[in-house]
Every structure is written in structure tokens, then in C-alpha cells.
Amino acid sequence: ADGSTAFVVHLSDEELSARLIEDFLMKPLRGATEGATVQSAAYAIYRLLRHVCGCTAGTPEHLPAWQEKQLNRRSDAWSRLSEAQRRAVEMWASLDGVTRHAVLPYLSTNPNMNNTAYPDDPSPLYRPGVRYASWLCRWALQLQARVEKLRDGGAASTEQKRRAELLLCVKPCLHQNDAALALQLIPYLLLHLLHHAPDKSASATLAPSLEEMRAVLTHAEQPAAAAAAPPAAAGAGETAASGSLALCCEATFFVLDTLGAWESQQKRADQFREARKLRAFTEAVPRMLLARAALRCGAACRALRYVEQHADETARPTPQEFNLSKGEARRELPADEVALLHAAYGRIDEPDAFVGLGRMRSATSLVEEVRELQHQGRYSAAVSCYQTALQQQQFRQQA
């Protein structure tokens, strides 16, 4: 999304409600979808309009007064409205005209939904072979249960309860496995818990989500170490993760990327305490675990970024004998991390990087030699090395 429509950290309740309605909840109503999916979306729209934004059947009548205000004209009708009524009218005005026409009936109706009780499954929810949409929505529902518990705990302010109500309104849609909505909602659910969970219980509240992400990423690197196994065919690279697992990894990357971007936004707004909480949460997921999972999902550039972040975070103090400027650190990587870099550079066709990596260690593996020879166009030599690697692998299996 561009800057005008992005889901940023500082959206008000009215702005976030409008974007959820426009971008997600209106789709079932505009399409040919029927049954529980439409009912769930309609109920969520009703809850957002009536219970979060305070819209009523009379709200559309105040739209002309809002338009007068936008033209910088004096409006007695606008001045007579309360602050809550003005926020409701502004939210209503922010909706597209087609959307306003479609959701108008929900301002004067009172639909009901059966609140089905779902068990709070233990973490991690991710299991090998799980469907992506099912896993993502169950994760969002797990977070909603914690937000609901925090809201009902008695210590929440009026503003916190209002935001919690917003995040809980779409629960019926998650029961219909709306993965796109769940993916957009999870960062906001985590943000709410990070900012408002009591310090003494924050770790226990957020630990299941960290465990969830680690479970996905750990499974992504299980099927055989990509950098250690011979390529399946020339140029094929390492074995790709399964489609569902790759989607789960991409969702994890999206959540961490979003929270990282929000950390920067909060720093710019001088909200340093909130930014520190976000940073601590995102840094709890090991960078090298992210890098290995990214490489197996085919995201070589992302893998390189994670390795570079890891190198920056673990840079050692500079010994006196190294001729570096004050404040600089010499970055040294273990052999397994250099091997991952080698595999990633091979994916993005960066032959010059192989020269630099070669200077970081005295020997390379046969698999890495195959990769370098392929990039140099020396295919006969690459085939010979590949055959040698296969023979060594067969010998180890026989031994």
C-alpha cells in the first residue's frame, strides 16, 4: 500500500476501522459470497460502526455540516455536535460513497451472532502440514483471547478498552479463515499487548507468539541443511520449502517487518519507551534462524539482510592490531554463517562476493566450489566437483 493507505502505527480507532471496512470487510459484501462469510463481515461492520466509532442512524444527516467545515465555512450545525459525534461523522465521511450506501442499513439494525467457544490450544499452533489460513487465523484468535482478558482485567483505560473492542469486532471473520484480515490484524494485536500488558505478566503474555514464530522458522530449516547438501540439479539451488510452510514463513517475516517499521515510526514521534518494547520483542527472534528460513523460502536478499543485522549486533571489540577507526568493530562470522552467505550470494548471482568470502576462510566445501564454478561458466569443472560430492555422500552413507 502507498503512504495514504498504509496501516501505520499511529492510526486512530476511526481511521483503522474505516480501513478494515474498506479493505477487508466489504469484499464479501461486494462479491457473490453467501452464508456465514457475509454474515460475519456484516456483523463486524456493524460492531465497528456502532460500538467503536459511535455512528448512529442520524450520523449521515450531519455530513453536509462536515462538508461546510471542510470548506472553512461557519457551520452552526457542526458546532452543536459533541466531540464524539464529530469523530463519528468524520469517520463516516472517510468511507467511499459506494461503501456508505452499502453499510447504511447497519446504522439502524441490531444483528446478532452466536459466540462459539473455541478451545485455547497450547502453543505452538503450527504443525507440519497445517493449512496456512487455518494456522494464521488460529494465531490471531489466540492473541484476541489475550486482548480480551486484558480488557476485562479491570485496569484498562477507556481508550484501551475501545481499541480492544475494535480488535475483537472481527472475530467472526477469523472463524471463517479470513487469512488476509488475520495477517493485517496480528501486528496490531501484538502492539496492543506490548503496550498495555502489565510488566509483570508481559513476558508470559507474549511468549506464545515468540514460540509460534520460532516453530515456523525452525521447521523451515529442518528438511536438510541447504548449504550442506549438494544441489539437486545445476542451478537448482537448495530444496524449496513447501508452499504452505513458505506462506507461514512469509507471514512471520511480514509481522516482524511491520513491527520493525512501527518501531521507527514511534522513535520519530519521540515514543521511545514504546519503541524499546517493540525492539525487544523483534530481537527475541534470532537473526540467523530468520536468515536460514528466508534462504529456504527463496528470499536470498532477505537472508543477507538478516545475516548483516546479526553481524552488526554481535560485532566484537576491535583489537589494537587492526587498523580501524575509533568506534568501529571488526565483524567475524563463524564458518556456518559464512556458508549461508555463500549460498545466498549464489542465489542472487553475485560472483564478486565469492572473492570476499574466500578471504574470510582458508577452505571451501565441494558444494560451494560447484556454485562458484557455475557462476564462472566452468560447467565441466562444476560437474566433476558435483560428482565428487555425490561419491563422498554415498561413501558416508555406506560407512
Where do the language-model regions lie?
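Eukaryotic intrinsically disordered, low-complexity segments enriched for acidic and Ser/Thr/Pro residues
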Residues: A1-A399
